[in-house]
From Swiss-Prot:
Organism the protein comes from: Salmo salar
Gene Ontology BP annotations: chromatin organization; mRNA export from nucleus; positive regulation of DNA-templated transcription; protein transport; transcription elongation by RNA polymerase II
Transmembrane segments: none
Matches recorded under InterPro entries: TF_ENY2 (IPR018783), TF_EnY2_sf (IPR038212)
Gene Ontology cellular-component terms listed: DUBm complex; nuclear pore; nucleoplasm; SAGA complex; transcription export complex 2
Subunit structure: Component of the nuclear pore complex (NPC)-associated TREX-2 complex (transcription and export complex 2). Component of the SAGA transcription coactivator-HAT complex. Within the SAGA complex, participates in a subcomplex of SAGA called the DUB module (deubiquitination module).
GO MF annotation terms: transcription coactivator activity
Source organism superkingdom: Eukaryota
Localization per record: Nucleus, Nucleoplasm
Protein known as: Transcription and mRNA export factor ENY2-2
Chief location bin: nucleus
Length: 95
């Protein structure tokens, strides 16, 4: 395991143990709903299903098609806020 991987695992463990990971996930869900991200992705899913036909689309197909667009559509302000929260948490709980 690389040094970077170990650090990520440690951070993830600390976020999980302290309950911060769940709080961040809830914040992310709320922010994405608030900015219309979920509605945009839902509409894109419907477009993909219409284009390919319901019988020809699997959940895996949708995930492959939607994931890149979903990542791009997350507003920078949401990304920055989450990153700020993670940094603040780590600064407060640094050992």
């Amino acid at each position: 395991m690389s040094k970077d991987s170990k650090m990520r695992a440690t951070i993830n463990q600390k976020l999980t143990e302290m309950g911060e990971r769940e709080r961040l996930k809830e914040l992310l869900r709320a922010k994405l709903t608030e900015c219309g991200w979920r509605d945009q992705l839902k509409a894109h899913c419907k477009d993909v299903i219409k284009e390919k036909g319901l019988e020809h689309v699997t959940v895996e197909d949708l995930v492959v098609e939607i994931t890149p667009k979903g990542r791009v559509l997350v507003p920078d302000s949401v990304k920055k806020e989450l990153l700020q929260r993670i940094r603040a948490f780590l600064a407060q709980h640094a050992t």
